[in-house]
Amino acid sequence: METEAAVTATVTAATMGIGTRKRDLKPYKGIRMRKWGKWVAEIREPNKRSRIWLGSYATPEAAARAYDTAVFYLRGPSARLNFPELLAGLTVSNGGGRGGDLSAAYIRRKAAEVGAQVDALGATVVVNTGGENRGDYEKIENCRKSGNGSLERVDLNKLPDPENSDGDDDECVKRR
């Protein structure tokens, strides 16, 4: 009778998700999610108690790629990575590995570059269902219509031109 109760308690705990919460919130090594939804990455320096802050990112993949870059620079090709296939071509001579001259600031800068690239790629996703339906759409973010009806990228670092501002540039959708 006690075994049945233990089995029932184990099954109930497993179906309720008790004990699996931490694994669900951290899909990759070296990252965590803030209360407000941003993903952050950090790594401990070898043989020290201090941590290297790698940045805050919109997606867990970007934070994980930043962590992978940092761990590769710190520990070399033998490091356990979240995405080992993406760093397979790099060697110690290409910049990664146990170089004694690598400062925390250098590692932070390199990791932030990679994370920012992944975030930027995720922000400009092009959806193309491409098919026989007449309702196929292609959505492009950060764009505006040019004079000939085509779409062109907008430089988000520049102030908007008051002459071309008509209020319709919130979202560009081009019918295919």
Curated annotation (Swiss-Prot):
Start-end of DNA-binding region: 27-84
Single GO BP term: ethylene-activated signaling pathway
Localization terms from the record: Nucleus
Record keywords: Activator, DNA-binding, Ethylene signaling pathway, Nucleus, Transcription, Transcription regulation
Region (Disordered) location: 138-176
Residue ranges with Acidic residues bias: 163-176
Sample GO molecular function, one term: transcription cis-regulatory region binding
Record bears the keyword Nucleus: yes
One Gene Ontology cellular component annotation held by this UniProt entry: nucleus
Segments of skewed composition (Basic and acidic residues): 152-161
Matching CDD domains: AP2
InterPro entries: AP2/ERF_dom (IPR001471), AP2/ERF_dom_sf (IPR036955), DNA-bd_dom_sf (IPR016177)
Membrane-spanning intervals of the chain: none
Coarse class of the protein's main subcellular location: nucleus
Protein task: Probably acts as a transcriptional activator. Binds to the GCC-box pathogenesis-related promoter element. May be involved in the regulation of gene expression by stress factors and by components of stress signal transduction pathways.
Family per record: Belongs to the AP2/ERF transcription factor family. ERF subfamily.
Protein name as it appears in the record: Ethylene-responsive transcription factor ERF008
Originating organism: Arabidopsis thaliana
Gene: ERF008
